[in-house]
Amino acid sequence: MDFNLNDEQELFVAGIRELMASENWEAYFAECDRDSVYPERFVKALADMGIDSLLIPEEHGGLEAGFVTVAAVWMELGRLGAPTYVLYQLPGGFNTFLREGTQEQIDKIMAFRGTGKQMWNSAITEPGAGSDVGSLKTTYTRKNGKVYLNGSKCFITSSAYTPYIVVMARDGASPDKPVYTEWFVDMSKAGIKVNKLEKLGLRMDSCCEITFDDVELDEKDMFGREGNGFNRVKEEFDHERFLVALTNYGTAMCAFEDAARYANQRVQFGEAIGRFQLIQEKFAHMAIKLNSMKNMLLEAAWKADNGTITSGDAAMCKYFCANAAFEVVDTAMQVLGGVGIAGNHRITRFWRDLRVDRVSGGSDEMQILTLGRAVLKQYR
């Protein structure tokens, strides 16, 4: 088994290091986090490197580099302090439209390639339908040759500034036998109200409540096939959970290295605190968790590239990495002491971000349920 990166992957990682060393990005990230602003200038710099084309097929002008390459890039970005959670739509967002969208929809989304701007996101969660997706109440109703969308969504990522949202709704004409379909919605349409929510972490990406009051659509705005909404988003959930896990690992690695540098230079009782056995124990446990996360993620990326990744794999990565990474960051904060809880150290941002990730993108509890079912299914 060869864990070395290939030449193309090494070039991407080297490019990431060069970009992150080109200026004081941390000051920019801190400002964006404080003001809850999407770091568009940073994402544009990544797009200029071709990061938003990593998974796009070659026939569409992409690199088709694969998930192991995505993993290598995400891990390095995270290790160097970048908020990779704002990039979730970059690796697969274009491919989703190339696979499911009409030509008109594809053209609208592909126009954002290389810009660094937010382009679209899914709107599924509702006040009464979180993990219980089958309880969705938002409806679409056909009338006089048009389609009307009514209902409300909540905790919808990126929706304060994305020009398009793909909304999951149920057929209002079929109350007894629910039919779930997605619709491609231009956020400038009449009847849409957006309320931005404050969050503990992940502040560089918006989170909103959205209401739809007789929002008028056309049949051509259907996204994918009618009644195929759940099947389509299942794949998106797995993709998102893998990316969340990559983000968690990278962030934890950054916190670990910050704490290690501090432990080797912080002197108490006449010597660096890194020489104290209690501190060494903390680093041993952090290193075990980081190594376990990395190996799990690389295996999942390899499976994704070979078409064998399952929902159980994605759930395992999401659950383990969200929890292990938070534990690493929390321990690193303990090593930093007062420096980590007062002032402007970036570990406070990491701590807030990773606590949110145990809920965002699928709660811990739902990952356990998904994984448990997948494990037992193998032995039936």
From Swiss-Prot:
Highest taxon above the source species: Bacteria
Annotated source species: Salmonella typhimurium (strain LT2 / SGSC1412 / ATCC 700720)
Name of the featured protein: Crotonobetainyl-CoA reductase
Subunit: Homotetramer.
Cofactor needs: FAD
SUPFAM superfamilies named in the record: Acyl-CoA dehydrogenase C-terminal domain-like, Acyl-CoA dehydrogenase NM domain-like
HAMAP family: CaiA
Pfam families for the chain: Acyl-CoA_dh_1, Acyl-CoA_dh_M, Acyl-CoA_dh_N
Recorded family membership: Belongs to the acyl-CoA dehydrogenase family.
